[in-house]
Amino acid sequence: MPDAIWGIKRDVVAHFGLHDLPQEPLYRDLCGVITEGGAVHPHRDSNQGMLVHTRFNVMVSRPDGGGVPMIDGMLVDVPEGGIFRVDAGLLTHSCTPVIGARPRIILSFGFLSPLGRFSGLPFCISTP
């Protein structure tokens, strides 16, 4: 994995104070690339005991159209370079189909957080 990606994770951890949270053990950290016509189906991820599967996602490449995150029935407009949080173990989430040749690329960093840790924080929480 390129050092630049670990640098982005370090920045996300520092910015949102995630140092004390364990890493989500199943998906851990991942890079998602979705090309034209692809989408993420609506789903909810599993939690670990009393800890909530929480993901902080960086929108590395925003497609020409579509690829918009949907969290708990709400479309979340995330600019390229923006960060969006998903309480993946609590809320149904997906993304709309990608339109055009430009792919949707996200870096997704997974954590386990206590219930309510991020309540009141909007889904799209940082912009470039």
Model-identified regions with their sequence ranges:
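Catalytic core of Fe(II)/2-oxoglutarate
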Residues: 62-128
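N-terminal accessory scaffold of Fe(II)-dependent oxygenases
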Residues: 1-16, 26-36, 53, 104-106, ...
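Catalytic core of non-heme Fe(II) oxygenases with the double-stranded beta-helix
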Residues: 15-88
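Intrinsically disordered, low-complexity segments used for protein-protein interactions
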Residues: 10, 41, 120-123
